Amino acid sequence: MEQYVIKGGNPLVGEVEIGGAKNAALAILAAAIMTDEMVYIENLPDVRDINVLLEAIREIGASVERVSPTEVRITGSTIANISVEYEYIKKIRASYYLLGALLGKYKTAEVPLPGGCNIGSRPIDQHLKGFRALGASVDILHGAVVAKAEKLTGKHIFLDMVSVGATINIMMAAAMAEGNTTIENAAREPHVVDVANFLNSMGANIKGAGTDVIRIKGVEKLHGTSYSIIPDQIEAGTFMCAAAATMGDIMVKNVIPKHLEATTAKLEEIGCEVEEFDDAVRVVASKRLKRTHVKTMPYPGYPTDMQPQFTVALTLAEGTSIVTESIFENRFKYADELSRMGANIKVEGNTAIIDGVHKLTGARVSAPDLRAGAALVIAGLAAEGITIVDDIVYIQRGYERFEEKLRCLGAEIEKVSSEKDIQKFQLRVG
């Protein structure tokens, strides 16, 4: 079992290059099998979730050629099986995108119920509602979603709640349906737009992505394409919060600043200086942070995936801050770990009340999920002394070369796999 061992207390300073958006890439990889022609995708993040999904796609018969860690060629003409093995799918929640892709192309799909981070109930009822509206019969049998249709027909679909996954899945299923489909109360996230742009580059007719009403005119078939995935706004936001928490100065490169507006606004609110460039943002924290209130909301509101990282910065801010989580339950499981590092944080339902302290101290902590794991790494970098983060497999699901990028900013962090390695690190850093 690998761990991160960190000696904290130093400001992070320098430049960091952001990779492709994991959440966009997962959906785009699934959508790539919807044509029999070759699809070339670049700016792919080299993270565990991507590798698992590529294995699942290869397992159902598609040709997958990993040109480089950030490039792949996929050809869906050789798919021989519309049933995806549980072995792959139990590891990642985004496996459900194969439902929309397979159903859209073959009018039948069988995909096990998804796994991924344990951050509360994330039902897929809105996905299934959309598939049924398009004319599919959908059952859950032996732990798998089985969807079948004689044909798919466009419909007016109103989502009962804003759901990124459901918006994307319905968009894929409707791309080759007969007639017109309208999705109301659609998610507006940048990766929804990226998936729509990708499908359109394959010949789909999708309009309105990025608004709450998406209109899809079904086409007969999709063709091959070359496509570059947008930068990962959550990875970018994570480094922005790391600058804030460590009193650092980081230039975050290869980003779309508009996608970071909510994070930027909150960092400025707590006293950081944020400078925007065409494809970069610079975050400078030169004085003690100020308190604030933040509530997670669907895009363009403050993202739930940035809540733990920002909370770490607030543990060191002056005064009392309040963080309200309105998207997922159980998203404060990292709070007890922060308390062990000296944070004064109290969780009441979906709200965390944080009384800022002057310093955190290193401790052994465990990552409960992907974003909370990254937040605990930030806490370790800001803390005095040695921090050990266990269960970093969660972090590896969504951050490529995380420790390498942090070291380039001056962090003292290593990935280790034994107590002996930890002792060596402690001796080396004193």
What are the residue ranges of the model-derived segments?
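Short, structured segments at the rim of ligand-binding sites
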Residues: M1-G430
